[in-house]
A protein has these predicted regions:
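C-terminal membrane-solvent junction of multi-pass transporters and transport-like membrane proteins
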Residues: 1, 142-145, 323-331, 373-434
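Transmembrane helix-boundary motif of multi-pass solute transporters/channels
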Residues: 1-97, 200, 206-209, 216, ...
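Helix-loop-helix junctions that connect adjacent transmembrane segments
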Residues: 29-30, 108-116, 144-285
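Helix-loop-helix module between adjacent transmembrane segments
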Residues: 45-48, 75-138, 153, 164, ...
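Membrane-water interface regions at transmembrane-helix termini and the short interhelical loops
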Residues: 49-51, 75, 123-149, 211-215, ...
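Membrane-helix boundary/coupling elements in multi-pass transport proteins
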Residues: 56, 79-94, 203-216, 278-321, ...
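TM-loop-TM module centered on a large, flexible mid-protein loop between adjacent transmembrane helices
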Residues: 62-64, 69, 101-106, 226-300, ...
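Membrane-interface loop-to-helix entry segments
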Residues: 117-174, 226-231, 365, 371-377, ...
């Protein structure tokens, strides 16, 4: 069980999600605590229950296939793939943002330079392709590097809440607002929107623990018990990280495309006018650039995982067998990898056309999260719909947890068409998100039924 606690923290905590919470100001504390209660704990309960019923079938795809049928299982996998594809497609935008902060104020123009972002997108996906083709030999070191940098930056952010690099008795640090507030938040449409994004984005991912269910003694109970330990730790980490951002950046000016580079740039900004080298400033900028490299490393791992989905779909006869062929030298699905990289590159270039970086990031993030939301809706529906067919009926509290998870997920999906940054047209933003989401799922349904038709012939 104790191995599952750090695993849950690493899978759930994302260093960028504190930026969304920081938009709420000091009352973010209440939002994180509510998100733990209404999403994280229900998620842990449902994942633990499913892992207990199907202890050797790690993953939402298999649970949905057994409980609700092959179509539900396929749409789970399809929407997870859509989310992963869109998650990595913003690599050019995020890298440009990191570099603009890492090089200092004179490089601020980089963040919204469409040509440069397009160049970053193409070059970085070529790097990701090169890393993934040889397989796990290189990929595991890329993964270790990304994880190490994430942990380092998380600890650094929490440290910056208590230590201000350029503060002195003569020039003490002054927070732009209170990092924490015990006052009740004002409930508006925007604050509810922010809450759903905090909960859904910041606290999802726990279901990936189920991959190891077959290697865990009494997996269902172990996952639930470890979640009770991990939950308060995750809450403290997120609250401290968000408070750290608010100690340096006004809530209204938080940059959602790069909140971590932004806070590092603000915290380590030059504090003296002397001609000597400002090592604090150099450290901050170096950390920003290393974080950009780590982001590419993390996205390379996501591409590696996602590239196996077309291969498995090919084995099941859903798509052409062309995707299932392995490279004779590396024994990796090079064709699937190439297709995933090509699609992600195209989506990344398309999303930035005619919009600023903030709006493009929101469009990509929103469409991807619609896919992840459908994935979660199917998962939370399992305890409510499976009955006693597998020998275990979900009890009252388990069903209540499933309903809570369903409600938060559905609310988060409804708010995905509403931007939380300034956009040229809210109606155009909503139309782009809704239209792209419908098109993605229509394509998934068409592929499934075409595969079933061919399998019957």
């Amino acid at each position: 069980m104790w191995d599952l606690v750090p695993m849950q923290i690493l899978l759930v905590v994302g260093i960028t999600w504190g930026g969304i919470a920081a938009k709420q100001g000091g009352t973010h504390v209440w939002f994180w605590l509510a998100a733990i209660v209404f999403l994280f704990v229900p998620l842990a309960a449902v994942v633990g229950w499913c892992a207990q019923v199907w202890p050797l079938e790690g993953g939402v795809y298999q649970w949905a296939k057994f409980a609700l049928g092959p179509f539900a299982g396929f749409m789970c996998a399809w929407n997870f793939g859509v989310w992963a594809l869109l998650a990595v497609s913003n690599v050019g935008i995020l890298t440009a943002t990191s570099i603009s902060y890492g090089l200092g104020p004179h490089a601020a123009w980089i963040e919204d330079n469409h040509l440069l972002i397009a160049g970053f997108t193409i070059v970085l996906f070529l790097v990701i392709l090169a890393v993934n083709l040889p397989g796990f030999g290189i990929g595991r070191w890329v993964s270790h590097f990304g994880t190490a940098v994430t942990v380092m930056v998380t600890l650094l952010l929490m440290g910056l809440l208590f230590y201000h690099p350029h503060a002195s008795p003569a020039h003490p640090h002054v927070n732009p607002q209170a990092p924490f507030s015990v006052g009740k938040p004002v409930f508006t449409l925007m604050t509810i929107n922010l809450f759903t994004k905090i909960a859904f984005n910041g606290l999802g991912g726990l279901e990936q623990v189920a991959v190891f269910a077959g290697e865990t003694r009494n997996a269902g109970r172990a996952i639930m018990r470890s979640a009770w330990i991990a939950a308060p730790l995750i809450a403290v980490i997120y609250i401290l990280m968000t408070g750290s951002m608010l100690a340096y950046i006004p809530a209204a000016k938080v940059d959602l495309t790069g909140p971590i580079p932004q806070i590092l740039a603000a915290a380590f900004a030059g504090g003296s006018g002397s001609a000597s080298i400002d090592w604090g400033l150099m450290l901050g900028r170096a950390t920003i650039l290393v974080l950009a490299v780590a982001l590419v490393a993390q996205y390379a791992v996501i591409v590696a995982e996602t590239s196996r989905l077309p291969m498995v779909a090919g084995w099941d006869g859903m798509i052409p067998a062309w995707f299932t062929r392995l490279d004779p030298r590396w024994k990796t699905p090079t064709r699937s990898i190439a297709v995933i990289v090509a699609l992600a590159t195209g989506l990344g270039l398309l999303a930035t056309y005619g919009t600023g970086a903030q709006e493009a990031f929101q469009v990509i993030n929103s469409v991807g999260n619609v896919g992840y939301g459908i994935y979660y809706l199917i998962m939370f529906a399992i305890p409510l719909m499976v009955g006693e067919r597998f020998g275990v009926r979900a009890g009252f509290w388990m069903q209540a947890a499933a309903v809570s998870g369903l409600a938060v997920t559905a609310l988060a999906m409804a708010f995905l068409v509403l931007p939380i940054v300034d956009v040229a047209s809210k109606w155009n933003f909503a139309a782009r998100v809704a239209g792209a989401s419908l098109a993605m799922n229509a394509a998934g349904v068409a592929i499934y039924w075409n595969g079933m038709r061919q399998a019957r012939q």
